[in-house]
Amino acid sequence: MINMTRKLYYEDAYLKEAKGRVLEIRDNAILLDQTIFYPTGGGQPHDRGTINGVEVLDVYKDEEGNVWHVVKEPEKFKVGDEVELKIDWDYRYKLMRIHTGLHLLEHVLNEVLGEGNWQLVGSGMSVEKGRYDIAYPENLNKYKEQIISLFNKYVDEGGEVKIWWEGDRRYTQIRDFEVIPCGGTHVKDIKEIGHIKKLKRSSIGRGKQRLEMWLE
């Protein structure tokens, strides 16, 4: 099967509602011609919401890049139906802020620790917080206040988040900072991220540390 899903969440990450047409149904998963639902990937959880008022339980991408929506009541759909899509915008927007916030944190760590002096070994996010797992020899608590202060300063200044494609690779860049390959959804300006409310450092063994970030 070729890729048949138009990914509206890449064209406009701020779309909250859209229409789509059912192309195929497999068990409890439906394939649409276009979608605003972001599928799980790149450390970012899938969107929540409804299709024709039916709850969406999971969203995933297959090997061809088609986006499948696992729904609570698949029997309410048939191939050819035109359907109404609505995402849980509060949930998505929190994830957008956290995802862009992690990219900004990466730049701040490069400034504070020195680019090339630390290594990102893992990451993740939920609607509550973002996480980076880092290989670095010194205890990051030493730099915590500096990291928070610089992060919040950049947020106050603001700056455009640029997104573009090169072939099938998607790239993001905050201001004139690092270019980061990324398939996630992001805010348009880093002012939208908000300040860091809490930054927690913990050891995860063998010279690796975890930074967890909560936003205001």
Curated annotation (Swiss-Prot):
Keywords: Cytoplasm, Metal-binding, Zinc. Binds 1 zinc ion per subunit. GO terms for cellular component: cytoplasm. It is found in: Cytoplasm. InterPro entries: Ala-tRNA-synth_IIc_core, Ala-tRNA-synth_IIc_N, Alanyl-tRNA_Editing_Enzymes, Thr/Ala-tRNA-synth_IIc_edit, Transl_B-barrel_sf, tRNA_SAD. Gene3D superfamilies: 2.40.30.130, Threonyl-trna Synthetase, Chain A, domain 2. Its main location: cytoplasm. GO terms for molecular function: alanine-tRNA ligase activity; aminoacyl-tRNA deacylase activity; ATP binding; metal ion binding; nucleic acid binding. Monomer. This is Alanyl-tRNA editing protein AlaX-M. It comes from Pyrococcus horikoshii (strain ATCC 700860 / DSM 12428 / JCM 9974 / NBRC 100139 / OT-3).
